[in-house]
Regions:
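Catalytic machinery of carbohydrate-active enzymes
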Residues: 1-226
Length: 226
């Protein structure tokens, strides 16, 4: 009789057991990035879009974002299209995922460094030619490199900042990043709104900014805000 862990491992292997498509990643022209999580994660991923677009200006870059972090990409000249994903509601996302499948993406880049079943399910539906991800720790006794769904894993050095770990996903494209600075494109209207909002509290209240991330490797340095 199968234990629960063995049963989950069996279905994980089954879900990720796909055939390899012959395609050179360096010839990709239509790329989808999966980044449907927190605001901070999107902020420290913005260098990836810029460095890829600078190397390949003709490439079409789409991002599957969350409702929470999508506004980080407002006015970003390096992102061509943003789609919204609800993460915990696969059925609600299905129309969008099928639309993405019809786009016939050359490459999908998934940034999770763990094995995430809902990400795998979305990738199976989207069905790109190639999938790039960060090296995975494995799950249910299944090693990350056993997951045949992924065509290319990039490294995750122990003490590296996640910004640089995610920039390394551009290596299969032959891109050597020249900068890891973040991109936030604030309009005059947004700046005016922020100033008006803050004035109602200043100087009565002291306003602080939390630079910490969920993990050490996602912390934003103070000098990076200047």
């Amino acid at each position: 009789m199968y234990s629960s862990k063995k049963l989950k491992a069996y279905f994980l292997r089954l879900l990720t057991n796909t055939k390899t498509t012959k395609f050179d990643i360096k010839n990709a022209r239509n790329i989808l990035f999966l980044r449907y999580d927190r605001i901070g994660d999107m902020v420290i991923t913005t260098p990836v879009f810029r460095e890829l677009k600078r190397e390949y200006p003709e490439i079409n870059i789409s991002v599957l974002a969350s409702k929470v972090n999508q506004t980080i990409l407002d006015n970003n000249p390096y992102v061509d299209k943003v789609y919204i994903n609800f993460k915990n509601n696969l059925l609600r996302d299905l129309p969008t995922l099928l639309k993405l499948r019809n786009k016939k993406y050359d490459v999908c880049v998934e940034f999770d460094h763990s094995v995430i079943p809902h990400s795998i399910a979305r990738l199976r539906i989207i069905k790109p030619k190639k999938i790039i991800s960060v090296i995975k720790e494995g799950r249910y006794g299944v090693k990350g490199d056993e997951l045949k769904l992924y065509d290319c894993f990039t490294d995750k050095p122990k003490d590296a900042h996640f910004r640089d770990i995610w920039l390394d996903t551009l290596r299969p494209f032959g891109v050597a990043p020249k900068s890891n600075e973040y991109d936030l494109y604030i309009t005059d209207k947004q700046e005016e709104f922020a100033n008006t909002y803050l004035k109602q509290y200043y100087p009565k209240c002291l306003i602080g900014i939390n630079l910490e991330g969920a993990v050490k490797g996602k912390r934003i340095q103070f000098v990076e805000l200047e």
